[in-house]
Amino acid sequence: MAEPRQEFDVMEDHAGTYGLGDRKDQEGYTMLQDQEGDTDAGLKESPLQTPAEDGSEELGSETSDAKSTPTAEDVTAPLVDERAPGEQAAAQPHMEIPEGTTAEEAGIGDTPSLEDEAAGHVTQARMVSKSKDGTGSDDKKAKGADGKTKIATPRGAAPPGQKGQANATRIPAKTPPAPKTPPSSATKQVQRKPPPAEPTSERGEPPKSGDRSGYSSPGSPGTPGSRSRTPSLPTPPAREPKKVAVVRTPPKSPSSAKSRLQTAPVPMPDLKNVKSKIGSTENLKHQPGGGKVQIINKKLDLSNVQSKCGSKDNIKHVPGGGSVQIVYKPVDLSKVTSKCGSLGNIHHKPGGGQVEVKSEKLDFKDRVQSKIGSLDNITHVPGGGNKKIETHKLTFRENAKAKTDHGAEIVYKSPVVSGDTSPRHLSNVSSTGSIDMVDSPQLATLADEVSASLAKQGL
């Protein structure tokens, strides 16, 4: 049941895209025109659907972002469980659409509100991009919010924590709008609307994921979580020729790449039939030939061996040098002549050989004379030899004078004891001092001591 709804949703989104292709530069006018189309279709709701000024819109966006991204089973679950009996009866023909029929053949294209809903998707995405860039005004935000609530009205009243907001945007494209919807469910859907838009809508281009597939929720457009459900419901190839204007493919997410690249498991290789490389198993039992070599010890037969170079032929050969005999004969020297006539003078004696040395005792006293007449003057006495050297003791002390005339008479007492014991007066000493030695016995004794000490020193 999920695949027919996928086809119908893609067809409706392309219809909205073709109808709004010439209104890219008139975003304000497109928004007002879509607003009026929604009002004519009978989808106008009570004033409770407008976003509140006290921040309830931001609160709803935060709660919707916290929810996990629903799977394909969660997308189809609200169609069966959460709707009223009247809505299930109205939605039953859309579940039965075969894959090969178009919307016009099934009778769905006559519904006046389907294209308006697709246009409301585009207007809503553009309004979100305007509010993200900061160029949109408050009244445009209110109009975008009204358009979202009108798109979300066909869904039954569901608790806020039961399904993600992505289901709210996918269900209206598959089921016709119901005029009777409780205001409380529309208010809850308004509170879940977050403001961000895709980065490509800032350049004036319609958002790719919102215009084409309609799977991305207004709470998280362009995020990997909102696009992860796209490859799980592939579009049949019968709807590909309908894409005439621009082929827009949603950006691939890591989860979608993993789901598409699910290859068949590789079978295990048959290890029994594996052939060895380079024929290694063929020679597995090969034994090297060197192991079978036997060393046989045989005695050599040397009887027929011939010597090299004919050495055996001369084995009994005796060298000729062995028979040489050395004969010793005495030499006859009688007939030998001396060289240079030496034999003729064999008895010659040298002339000096007959000289005789005689030793005779010489009488020097009688015959020998002294040279230069030295013997004649043997008794000579030198001329000064008879002179005698007389030694006289000098008595210079008696004649000595004092360098300074102190006026005293120096009495010299000769160390030689003589009979004359009277002191002798120096003749050279002046006696002007008139000091009498007899009168002063101390001076006399002093002079004697001085003279005695000088005499001892040898002066």
Swiss-Prot record:
Amino acid composition bias (Polar residues), ranges on this chain: 61-71, 419-434
Source organism superkingdom: Eukaryota
Residues modified to N6-acetyllysine: 163, 243, 277, 299, 308, 316, 329, 335, 339, 349, 361, 365, 387, 403
Location within or outside the cell: Cytoplasm, Cytosol; Cell membrane; Cytoplasm, Cytoskeleton; Cell projection, Axon
Free-text comment on this protein's domains from its UniProt entry: The tau/MAP repeat binds to tubulin. Type I isoforms contain 3 repeats while type II isoforms contain 4 repeats.
Name of the protein in question: Microtubule-associated protein tau
Record gene name: MAPT
Disulfide bonds: 309-340
Subunit structure: Interacts with MARK1, MARK2, MARK3 and MARK4. Interacts with SQSTM1 when polyubiquitinated. Interacts with PSMC2 through SQSTM1. Interacts with FKBP4. Binds to CSNK1D. Interacts with SGK1. Interacts with PIN1. Interacts with LRRK2. Interacts with LRP1, leading to endocytosis; this interaction is reduced in the presence of LRPAP1/RAP.
Compositional bias per record (Basic and acidic residues), positions renumbered to this chain: 1-27, 130-149, 200-211
Compositional bias (Low complexity): 212-232
Signal peptide as annotated in the record: none
One Gene Ontology term of the molecular function aspect: microtubule binding
Residue(s) carrying Omega-N-methylarginine: 155, 367
Function: Promotes microtubule assembly and stability, and might be involved in the establishment and maintenance of neuronal polarity. The C-terminus binds axonal microtubules while the N-terminus binds neural plasma membrane components, suggesting that tau functions as a linker protein between both. Axonal polarity is predetermined by tau localization (in the neuronal cell) in the domain of the cell body defined by the centrosome. The short isoforms allow plasticity of the cytoskeleton whereas the longer isoforms may preferentially play a role in its stabilization.
Modified sites of kind N6-methyllysine: 277
Keyword Transmembrane applies: no
Entry comment on modification after translation: Polyubiquitinated. Requires functional TRAF6 and may provoke SQSTM1-dependent degradation by the proteasome.
Topology within the bilayer: Peripheral membrane protein
Residues carrying N-acetylalanine: 2
Keyword Membrane among record annotations: yes
